[in-house]
Amino acid sequence: MITIYTSKGIKHKVQSVIKTHGTNNVYEICDIQKIYILKNDLGQANGLLQHDKATDQYLIHINENLQHQQFVIAHELGHYFLHKRLNTFKVVNCSKVLKDKLEHQASLFASELILTDKMLNEALPYIQGFSKEQIAAYFNVPSFVTDYKLSQIGSFSNRIYSHEISAFG
């Protein structure tokens, strides 16, 4: 069975991962999960999650030439925590739509993991008035991560910290 997560479901999954592991640091999470990170020249690919059935070991391969390797590792962790029971290579007639949905979910997971709401709230005094690009640079994340996070914050009109939302507008 394929589980299609909502954005809210992904956020809750990330919060659970952070609580369980005591960190949002992708390297520490990989260490705790015994997931090895291998850096190689992957050509056009940014990264991939591999499972070795013989040893029941997971590996994350990342392209050594990438600027935002942390995001790619977080993306692959998204596949691990959201989709590890689903092997799209074995799903008969796996459509491009399904593949795109799974990739989108992994990217949302990565965005929530490397730029948490708590991080944004704590940095508010420093980043107030910053553009999305400046916020991305402040946290050293790709700009699409801040685009996603700020759109999510803006969508919660009944949020407790409503005064903080206006600062991200």
UniProtKB/Swiss-Prot annotation:
Residues that hold Zn(2+) according to the record: H75, H79
Question: Which InterPro entries does this UniProt record tie to the protein?
Answer: IrrE_HExxH
Functional description taken from the UniProt entry: Involved in the regulation of horizontal gene transfer through the integrative and conjugative element ICEBs1. Required for degradation of the ICEBs1 repressor protein ImmR/YdcN.
EC number(s) on file: 3.4.-.-
What's an example GO BP annotation here?
proteolysis
Q: Which UniProt keywords apply?
A: Hydrolase, Metal-binding, Metalloprotease, Protease, Zinc
The cross-references to Pfam families, in alphabetical order and at most eight, read: Peptidase_M78 (PF06114)
**The keyword Metal-binding belongs to this UniProt entry's keyword annotation:** yes
Organism of this sequence? Bacillus subtilis (strain 168)
So which domain of life are we looking at?
Bacteria
The upper taxonomy is: Bacteria, Bacillati, Bacillota, Bacilli, Bacillales
List the protein's name. Answer: Metallopeptidase ImmA
Q: Which residues form the signal peptide?
A: none
Root EC class:
hydrolase
What does the subunit comment say? Interacts with ImmR.
Q: What are the GO MF terms of this UniProt record?
A: metal ion binding; metallopeptidase activity
* Active site, per annotation: E76
